[in-house]
Swiss-Prot record:
Name of the protein: Cytidylate kinase
Gene Ontology annotations of biological process type: pyrimidine nucleotide metabolic process
Enzyme Commission numbers on file: 2.7.4.25
Keywords: ATP-binding, Cytoplasm, Kinase, Nucleotide-binding, Transferase
The organism's place on the tree of life at top rank: Bacteria
Length: 232
């Protein structure tokens, strides 16, 4: 069974995870949010009182993460048998302040890459989103999409996500956070965020979530037709 694999990449607050979750529900397939994996590790480090001054030391990280077991089950992420989604939401700001640093560390990227590729091997039908899926994690994906939107729209989406009061200070804080995240993601030395050469660019600035889901669904159906595949 060959299967059908979809890679979705894009910058912060481009709507990747929300859209991929809806598509996975529509197609009844596995959805893997790789950004969530980095958030889980970041939360694990915070809870285990990591010494951030030593975070770049590989031996220190290996020892600290030796008992960190991350896995997916029925589209939910677990760490050491605990479902993590709610706790990640509750500690969102604390995690946001450190996740870019954690995601830039070679040891952690390699650790999660092995996990991601194991998931890909064991799930013929899946949609995976992140920042290097089409370029590094799943370069042979059947369909690659680079999802983006202008920074003003992404800021607005993040404000709505946080249910912020939209005060001037809050807007500035979110704006600075997204701009800094963009800079780090596009310029990091290992697996920087970039569009795969064979990815379809989809700008969602002027379309809503449902319209985006429908456009991607149509792209999936078109690609499957080209591959002479009927089932999903």
């Amino acid at each position: 069974m060959k299967g059908f694999k979809i890679a979705i990449d894009g910058p912060a607050a481009s709507g990747k995870s929300t859209i991929c979750k809806l598509i996975a529900e529509k197609l009844n397939c596995v959805h893997i949010d790789t950004g969530l994996m980095f958030r889980v590790i970041t939360l694990y480090l915070i809870k285990n009182k990591v010494n951030w001054a030593q975070i770049t030391e590989e031996n220190y990280l290996k020892l600290l993460l030796n008992n960190c077991n991350i896995y997916y089950e029925k589209n939910h992420i677990y760490c050491n048998y605990q479902k993590m989604c709610l706790e990640i939401k509750l500690k969102r700001i604390e995690i946001d302040n450190k996740v870019s640093l954690v995601a830039s560390l070679p040891f952690i990227r390699q650790k999660l890459l092995l996990l991601q590729q194991e998931i890909i091997k064991n799930n013929p039908y899946l949609i995976m989103d992140g920042r290097d899926i089409g370029t590094i994690v799943m370069p042979n994906a059947d369909l690659k999409i680079f999802l983006t939107a202008n920074i003003e729209q992404r800021i607005l989406r993040r404000v709505n996500e946080f249910k912020s009061n939209k005060s001037v200070n809050e807007l500035q804080k979110i704006t600075n956070n997204i701009k800094l995240r963009d800079h780090k993601d596009f310029n990091r030395l290992i697996s920087p965020l970039k569009k795969a050469e064979d990815a379809i660019l989809l700008d969602t600035t002027d379309i809503n979530i449902i319209e985006t889901v429908n456009q991607i669904h149509n792209l999936i159906l078109h690609k499957k037709k080209l591959l002479n595949q009927n089932e999903f």
